[in-house]
From Swiss-Prot:
Species in which this protein is naturally found: Homo sapiens
Membrane topology annotation: Single-pass membrane protein
Tissue: Highly expressed in renal cell carcinoma cells but barely detectable in adjacent normal kidney tissue. Detected in some cervical and endometrial cancers. Expression also detected in fetal kidney with little or no expression observed in normal adult heart, liver, lung, pancreas, prostate or spinal cord (at protein level).
Protein name: Hypoxia-inducible lipid droplet-associated protein
Outcome of swapping T41K: No effect on lipid droplet targeting or protein expression
Function: Increases intracellular lipid accumulation. Stimulates expression of cytokines including IL6, MIF and VEGFA. Enhances cell growth and proliferation.
Residues covered by region (Disordered): 31-63
Organism domain of life: Eukaryota
GO molecular function annotation: signaling receptor binding
UniProt xrefs under Pfam families: HILPDA
Swiss-Prot/TrEMBL induction comment: By hypoxia but highly abundant under normoxic conditions (at protein level).
Length: 63
């Protein structure tokens, strides 16, 4: 009987933890809503602009 109670309490704790994580993620999304996806767009923009900036600087390619 004790093992069943421990498993039940473990399930309750994991459920509450998952709910807490989802609430924190939604709050983070609401805080970033004025500029949605800023961290991801800046990372992708940096990844896209770094190679294009580097290519024209090579003298062999400009000749």
């Amino acid at each position: 009987m004790k093992h069943v109670l421990n498993l039940y309490l473990l399930g309750v704790v994991l459920t509450l933890l998952s709910i807490f994580v989802r609430v924190m993620e939604s709050l983070e999304g609401l805080l970033e809503s004025p500029s949605p996806g800023t961290s991801w767009t800046t990372r992708s923009q940096l990844a896209n602009t770094e190679p294009t900036k580097g290519l024209p600087d090579h003298p062999s390619r400009s000749m």
